[in-house]
């Protein structure tokens, strides 16, 4: 036990003592040999950027609070930690600092590990790993070669978003206003060979599995459903003719609105479609347009808002029913990566087609009307003015201008057309998914090498398992242009495992989402020879996963998919990796930047900026401390490494102590809401910690408490004890069911305030106070474990791991009141209150209510007709 002056809270001494005890006893190291129910709780693993920010602290404190609470409620709890260590930021730092990415990464891991340990998290550090080590990534290389052999990993050319500065492929979500999200460079479209995983083979299972994830937020499940994007429709064939009438390869289009087929007036294809590329060979104007469209937006938001552009390519498509020839156009809102890269254009009933047709003077035909228009506006159809009902499939519709299909509704038209096309071999029913196969190739150096060898004779050959891992060379010269392993002949050149001839290694590396898609399972058996061993089935699925909702689509989708791959490889038994998901809100803070030479922004940490504020605390100006020159104000944004606006938790821990920082991060907002960093709020939490420390020491300094004798308690003593057990019940519910940590803290603060007003130095008064203080220490232990560890000893309970002490249980008998205060109403209006014994008879309550002085005045001259008693709350006298 540390020696601390009474009433003086020294967080650093307290925290050092507690952490030394936990380390010496290996307090949080767990195994599978326990009769306790298991609870696997973790947060999304951090990228070792160099320093934690308060968003990390909030994330990891949430999982730590739950983990410690579960330990105290009798669970065998696993809370691990590791490092998502590959990725582009390490390369950028290597360029900036003239150091190898590996050296930079490992140094950051050491620093951030120390930061995490200073915060006192109950982590099993024996399971720690970094995803950039061969011991880790060998397993995903082995899995990839097995997926290749099963046909679930394949290589094909794909049109990608190419960042010419970072020299890599970007996901659609990483392209912002046509520029790379990190470099700010104008993004190009290129067709290059890429490796893919067939996530689309699992699309329906991924969709169906969402119905089983009752512990996931509905918002996340909705985003995943929309991303998977299941739609039922028809795939229809359009024959194609050139300018001479000669037949070319037909186009196949997928549509969910076959009822509008007779409204097709042209067919749109993507700029990368083979027909467009073929036509451009003899059409310089078209070729120039296709080159321009390479720089167009690719995200759905950009496709919706960007100006519609296109050109007829000189070919026609034959309408499969009318036989009419309609022109084929290139359109910038059609993407080769979605569907077949061709769509039937129905400008009368699709808004993008409508805008395109009006711009280029193409025909617009109405083929659907509302059966029951609600107003005059819905009775009119105007080819120059778009109305939402034109495409509203949820309304009762009827086909017009559609030959023999006139009068049919959507369902009738769908069935009639499906039967016709299937009979004639012109189409078929099809379920389509918006989800695309996962492109896992990245043209970067700092990533897991893709285990493939290219042989002129044998083609793409998976590296044999006995030659794995393919180790990424770490001591490289890194100039920042492309990947150094592409120009490293001793690494790149090898022999073919099949024929023994000269061959070359794949120089692309895996998308870093690969590493984060299976790490949760690896924690269960970090030293297993295979990817995981039997221990995985003890711990998996994880019981609680904590992370930001920004990961709802990419990480959490790949995470679920990869777990199913592992299940099908008989590595795990469970269908899903996690049963409960908590998506914490952002921690936000001010941002500042200067314009970069490349058109992007150089973000500056707020600690390096002198800020001017108005009387309301709003930022009005800022200068860089180093040179005194102005910087731009970027507004309040999520704390992140990309915006460089993180607060270093180490400085906060140094100033206030870890428990105070943890307490503020849990108190300032509910977990799901954004938390605005406010140091004044941290000061408030520090004052509470000092007050709690003083309360305990004052009580103990007055002598030992006697045993509690419930039967001997006074009314005031019973009231304090009742408050204690009400608090226990509320905090238990807030921790265990609601994850409402801010209200749990508020409840303990209320108990502390009540105890401060309880001035009873009698033996039983001190016994009640002892019980309340012990309860407060245990209730706060999941959030302020260091102080709780020390105060438990001060209260005379000895040095022990509080996680092995049972969480307090509310004594139901203590919640029973001896006396109750009831509201007295006359005809539903409040007229007074009465105090009655908890076991008072009905007749006594009625008499007291009628005798209440103010109520008696309102009853004067009236006859009491009925008295309604709501037990413990209200007496309502009905009189007239």
Curated annotation (Swiss-Prot):
Gene3D superfamilies: 2.20.28.290, 3.10.20.590, HUPs, Isoleucyl-tRNA Synthetase, Domain 1, Valyl/Leucyl/Isoleucyl-tRNA synthetase, editing domain. GO terms for molecular function: aminoacyl-tRNA deacylase activity; ATP binding; leucine-tRNA ligase activity. Keywords: Aminoacyl-tRNA synthetase, ATP-binding, Cytoplasm, Ligase, Nucleotide-binding, Protein biosynthesis. It comes from the Bacteria. Coiled coil: none annotated. ATP binds at residue 641. One of its GO terms (cellular component) is cytosol. It is found in: Cytoplasm. GO terms for biological process: leucyl-tRNA aminoacylation. A motif ('KMSKS' region) lies at residues 638-642. Its main location: cytoplasm. InterPro entries: aa-tRNA-synth_I_CS, aa-tRNA-synth_Ia, Leu-tRNA-ligase, Leu_tRNA-synth_edit, M/V/L/I-tRNA-synth_anticd-bd, Methionyl/Leucyl_tRNA_Synth, Rossmann-like_a/b/a_fold, tRNAsynth_Ia_anticodon-bd. Its EC number is 6.1.1.4. A motif ('HIGH' region) lies at residues 46-56. It catalyses: tRNA(Leu) + L-leucine + ATP = L-leucyl-tRNA(Leu) + AMP + diphosphate. Residues 483-502 are annotated as: Disordered. Belongs to the class-I aminoacyl-tRNA synthetase family. HAMAP family: Leu_tRNA_synth_B. This is Leucine--tRNA ligase. The gene is leuS.
């Amino acid at each position: 036990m540390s020696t601390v002056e009474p009433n003086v809270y020294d967080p650093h001494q307290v925290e050092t003592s507690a952490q030394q005890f936990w380390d010496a006893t290996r307090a949080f190291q767990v195994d599978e040999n326990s009769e306790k129910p298991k609870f696997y709780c973790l947060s999304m693993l951090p990228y070792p950027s160099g320093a934690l920010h308060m968003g990390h602290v909030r994330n990891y404190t949430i999982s730590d609070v739950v983990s410690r609470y579960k330990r105290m409620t009798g669970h065998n709890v696993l809370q691990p930690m590791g490092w998502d260590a590959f990725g582009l930021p390490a390369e950028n730092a290597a360029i900036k600092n003239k150091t190898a990415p590996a050296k930079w990464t490992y140094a950051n891991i050491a620093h951030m590990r120390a930061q995490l340990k200073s915060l006192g998290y109950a982590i099993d550090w024996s399971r720690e790993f970094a995803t950039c080590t061969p011991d880790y990534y060998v397993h995903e290389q082995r899995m990839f070669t097995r997926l290749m052999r099963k046909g679930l990993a394949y290589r094909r050319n794909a049109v990608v978003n190419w960042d010419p500065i970072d020299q890599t492929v970007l996901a659609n979500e990483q392209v912002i206003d046509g520029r790379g999200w990190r470099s700010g460079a104008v993004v190009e479209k290129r067709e290059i060979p890429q490796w893919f995983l067939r996530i689309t083979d699992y699309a329906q299972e991924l969709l169906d599995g969402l119905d089983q994830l009752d512990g996931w937020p509905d918002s996340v499940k909705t985003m995943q459903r929309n991303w998977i994007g299941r739609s039922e429709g028809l795939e229809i064939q359009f024959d194609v003719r050139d300018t001479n009438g000669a037949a070319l390869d037909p186009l196949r289009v997928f549509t969910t609105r076959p009822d509008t087929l007779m409204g097709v007036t042209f067919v749109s294809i993507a700029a990368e479609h083979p027909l467009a590329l073929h036509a451009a060979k003899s059409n310089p104007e078209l070729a120039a347009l296709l080159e321009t469209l390479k720089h167009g937006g690719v995200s759905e938001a950009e496709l919706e808002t960007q100006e519609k552009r296109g050109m007829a390519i000189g070919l026609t498509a034959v309408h499969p029913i009318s036989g009419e020839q309609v022109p084929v156009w290139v359109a910038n809102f059609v993407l080769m990566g979605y569907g077949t890269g061709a769509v039937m254009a129905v400008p009368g009933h699709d808004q993008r087609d409508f805008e395109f047709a009006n711009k280029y003077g193409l025909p617009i035909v109405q083929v659907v009307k509302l059966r029951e228009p609600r107003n005059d506006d819905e009775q009119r159809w105007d080819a120059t003015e778009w109305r939402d009902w034109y495409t509203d499939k949820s309304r009762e519709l009827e086909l017009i201008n559609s030959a023999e299909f006139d009068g049919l509704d959507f369902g009738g038209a769908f069935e009639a057309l499906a039967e016709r096309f299937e009979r004639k071999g012109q189409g078929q029913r099809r379920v389509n998914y918006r989800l695309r196969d996962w492109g896992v190739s990245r043209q970067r150096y700092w990533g897991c090498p893709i285990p493939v060898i290219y042989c002129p004779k044998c083609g793409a050959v998976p590296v044999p398992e006995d030659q794995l891992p393919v180790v990424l060379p770490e001591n490289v010269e890194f100039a920042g242009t492309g990947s150094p392993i592409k120009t490293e002949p001793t690494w790149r050149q090898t022999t073919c495992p099949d024929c023994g001839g000269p061959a070359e290694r794949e120089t692309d590396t895996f998308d870093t989402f690969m590493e984060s898609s299976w790490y949760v399972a690896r924690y269960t058996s970090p030293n297993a020879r295979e990817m995981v061993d039997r221990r995985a089935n003890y711990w998996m699925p994880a019981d609680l996963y904590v992370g930001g909702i920004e990961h709802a689509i990419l990480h959490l989708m790949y995470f679920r998919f990869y777990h199913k791959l592992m299940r099908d490889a008989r590595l795990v038994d469970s269908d899903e990796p996690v049963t409960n998901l908590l998506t914490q809100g952002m921690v936000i803070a001010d941002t500042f930047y200067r314009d970069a030479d490349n058109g992007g922004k150089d973000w500056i940490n707020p600690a390096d900026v002198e800020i001017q504020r108005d009387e309301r605390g709003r930022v009005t100006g800022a200068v860089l401390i180093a040179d005194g020159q102005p910087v731009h104000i970027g507004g309040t944004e999520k704390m992140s490494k990309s915006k460089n606006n993180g607060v270093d938790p180490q400085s906060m821990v140094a100033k206030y102590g870890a428990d105070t920082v943890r307490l503020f991060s849990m108190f300032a907002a509910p977990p799901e809401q954004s938390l605005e960093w406010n140091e004044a709020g941290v000061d408030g939490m520090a004052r509470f910690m000092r007050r709690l420390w003083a309360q305990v020491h004052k009580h103990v300094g007055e002598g030992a408490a006697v045993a509690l004798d419930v039967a001997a308690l006074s009314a005031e003593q019973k009231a304090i004890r009742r408050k204690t057990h009400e608090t226990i019940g509320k905090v238990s519910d807030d921790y265990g069911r609601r994850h409402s940590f801010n209200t749990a803290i508020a409840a303990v603060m209320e108990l502390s305030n009540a105890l401060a007003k309880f001035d009873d130095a009698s033996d039983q008064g001190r016994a009640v106070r002892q019980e309340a203080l012990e309860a407060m220490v245990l209730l706060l232990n999941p959030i302020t474990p260091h102080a709780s560890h020390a105060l438990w000893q001060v209260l005379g309970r000895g040095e022990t791991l509080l996680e092995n002490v049972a969480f307090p249980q509310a004594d139901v008998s203590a919640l029973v009141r001896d006396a109750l205060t009831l509201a007295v109403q006359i005809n539903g209006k409040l007229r007074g209150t009465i105090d009655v014994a908890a076991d008072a008879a009905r007749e006594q309550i009625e008499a007291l209510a009628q005798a209440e002085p103010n109520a008696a005045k309102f009853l004067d001259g009236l006859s009491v007709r009925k008295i309604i008693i709501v037990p413990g709350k209200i007496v309502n006298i009905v009189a007239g």
